[in-house]
């Protein structure tokens, strides 16, 4: 209740202890500030349901700069709404900080979010291919590859896209997992595992309860702001 549109959410690799949740990654290419705040709320509740020991997740708004004056009108209005909310909003975050754990939940519209996701996927694929080519270039490089094999296997495992298969269609009264059509059986198994974890954590009921509480707090803040603006308008007239 209170969610206008569902969003595609996905956990991304991070150098921090926990993964980073990003949404929307393509379901809604054009969003209002209110809808982006809704995404922040449902992302916040999902993260808390899956990582209760983490506490209040840090919410970041994906933008072209960290300053609050940066971005489109929609993004700047969203910034103001998130700042006045009871969420743990840490401000704007640039795309180069997404994989460094600067925020636990990253919010964007589906247009920007999908471009970010595809850029990350492309960069990982490019770097993997470039490393492979360099190690196969000559005999010396091949010998170096043998020595570096344990580290390379660890890196490959950490960045394996199949491990992150299974995007969540968040904001519905049910568990919906969207799998990548080009993945293999291992990728599908991770998507099924994601569905299992969501069902086991009872995330739906927790999200519904949390969303209701956050919306009630947000409406109270809006009412207070409207009253203050009305009072200021009256004082200006006098």
Predicted regions and their residues:
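Glycine-rich phosphate/diphosphate-binding loop of Rossmann-like nucleotide-binding domains
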Residues: 29-95, 104
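Glycine-rich phosphate/nucleotide-binding loop
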Residues: 1-18, 105-106, 110-220, 224-227
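Low-complexity, intrinsically disordered basic tails/loops
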Residues: 20-32
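General beta-strand structural signal in soluble alpha/beta enzymes
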Residues: 23, 88-93, 108, 166
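Structured loop/turn residues at beta-strand edges in well-structured enzyme cores
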Residues: 101
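Glycine-rich beta-alpha junction loops
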Residues: 27-29, 60-68, 94-98, 109-113, ...
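Active-site histidine-anchored catalytic micro-motif
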Residues: 14-23, 57
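Long, low-complexity, intrinsically disordered segments
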Residues: 231-238
């Amino acid at each position: 209740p209170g969610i206008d549109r569902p969003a595609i959410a996905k956990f991304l690799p991070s150098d921090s202890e926990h993964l980073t949740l990003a949404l929307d990654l393509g379901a809604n290419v054009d969003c209002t500030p209110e809808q982006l705040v809704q995404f922040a709320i449902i992302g916040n509740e999902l993260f808390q349901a899956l990582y209760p020991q983490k506490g209040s997740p840090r919410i970041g708004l994906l933008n072209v700069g960290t300053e609050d004056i940066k971005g489109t009108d929609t993004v700047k209005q969203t910034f103001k709404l998130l700042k006045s909310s009871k969420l743990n909003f840490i401000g704007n975050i640039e795309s180069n900080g997404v994989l460094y754990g600067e925020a636990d939940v990253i919010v964007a519209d589906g247009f920007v979010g999908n471009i970010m996701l595809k850029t990350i996927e492309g960069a990982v694929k490019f770097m993997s291919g470039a490393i492979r080519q360099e190690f196969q270039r000559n005999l010396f490089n091949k010998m170096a590859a043998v020595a570096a094999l344990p580290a390379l296997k660890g890196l490959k495992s950490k960045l394996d896209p199949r491990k992150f298969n299974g995007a969540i269609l968040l904001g519905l009264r049910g568990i919906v997992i969207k799998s990548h059509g080009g993945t293999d059986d291992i990728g599908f198994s991770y998507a099924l595992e994601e569905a299992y974890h969501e069902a086991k954590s009872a995330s739906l009921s927790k999200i519904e309860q949390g969303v209701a509480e956050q919306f009630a707090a947000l409406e109270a803040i809006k009412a207070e702001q409207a009253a203050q603006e009305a009072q200021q308008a009256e004082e200006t007239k006098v």
